[in-house]
């Protein structure tokens, strides 16, 4: 199988500067290569920072590469090489390579303590909603982490001044901590966020747009699971009006909540 051969080639050269762009290129969507309208739409949806190159792969192919790399005996060397590349030059790696690094961390078979340790140097690399959300939504290992341990791990990121570190904490909480016992704690954390202190590099959007949308998404998801509690919280909360409007919009857009009154 071509993809396995490509991954083996990468693993043999892991100690060099070569990363996996060359191995990803054969799996670029033909439509991305051949249809300008499709290519522009793909790039627009991902909305990476201008300096971040996008190759044009779909998520299933990216996940397949990551799973194969995670099975390599030298996978920790692979992750270390990714870390060195990101540290050497922020935008050297493509959007897809950046996501592969996170999905390898997700796919590893290791104790949760070790996984959190591997995750720490990756979180500062997040600078795009698609990388952040694809990582978080595929981090099923988080279900096996004691909830209080996961919550403590997320605390520094809730307090971060960087947009996607905060969004990371929001989406992880949405995916793995929206449980009855944690609902009030998560809701309280939303009110504690000071949006005025969070820096965004997306200067063409209401800053920090992707944190506001993360808050709205979390609340809309909570509405689907705990409608009465969520409505009560939103009504009484000190959340900004724009976050409340985004929440109502997300609720209307979701098939799970489009018939549920958001307030």
Indicate residue ranges for each PLM-predicted region.
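Alpha-helical scaffold domains
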Residues: 3-263
